[in-house]
Amino acid sequence: MLVLSGGTGTPKLLRGLKELLPPNDLAVVVNTAEDLWISGNYISPDIDSVLYTLADLIDEKKWWGIKGDKTLTHDFLLTLGVDEKLNVGDKDRATHIFRSNLLRRGVKLSLATEALAGAMGVEQKVIPMTDDIVSTVVATSEGVMHFQDFWVSRHGEPDVRSVVFTGLEEALPSLGFLSLLEKEDTVLIGPSNPVTSIGPILALPGVRERLRDKKVVAVSPLVGNRPVSGPAAKLMAASGVPASDEGVRDLLGHIDLFVVDKKSDYRGECKRMKTLMRTKNESLAVARGLLDMISCS
């Protein structure tokens, strides 16, 4: 199974799927449009969250970073007058250093990610959507800014006018992504932000066309027409769709099986189940329910 993932909602589902599927039966293609260089290191926030989840390292309170991590380096950088916009943990920074050293030597992001996965003991395939540079830029009431600046530094507070993915027109799907699209029959679009997490993956050249030949299952990230986390509602409105399951489906396009929460008022064709995943048992229940639905469809 191929899973398309962002960095918060879908890892909660992966927490369950990894317990139910053999490693060779689970591959994850991850959004890279929120990647950026900070303090001399290349950060791939969504890839890192997926890797940490599969390696049982994720901080499940925040769904980013490593559990129990400290921020001694970040704190001392602030003391030195360095305006490091992200509160990077010390162990998390080690991941960034590992990746950045490889990238500076000319290694592609795909191979750097494979090396990181191996070092962490992750057996599942984790593949970036592209090896090219794509950046999510948000036009807001306070100016144009990188998505991480909007969401982390400004807590998603500015009004959003539009969302643009710079570099997307020139970017190509990674070779690993293309290989999985050829091999896998089922594609699961995880419950991540449909605009900034899943949107860039689907917008890569040829991806939507290839998905038409697959069994595509999508889990809405909304519960009761509200995102569980993140600024999805603002971003969906700026993209011209309502912050609802109907809006999610419109953004995702071709779907064979659309799964929404039991509380949803969506009236289109769908399957309903409890999709809120606050605990590992809830992640297991959702994962098991999805696998049953897929096998029966």
Predicted regions and their residues:
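Active-site glycine-rich loop that binds ribose-phosphate moieties when present
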Residues: 161-180
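Gly/lys/ser-thr-rich phosphate-binding loops in alpha/beta enzymes
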Residues: 1-49
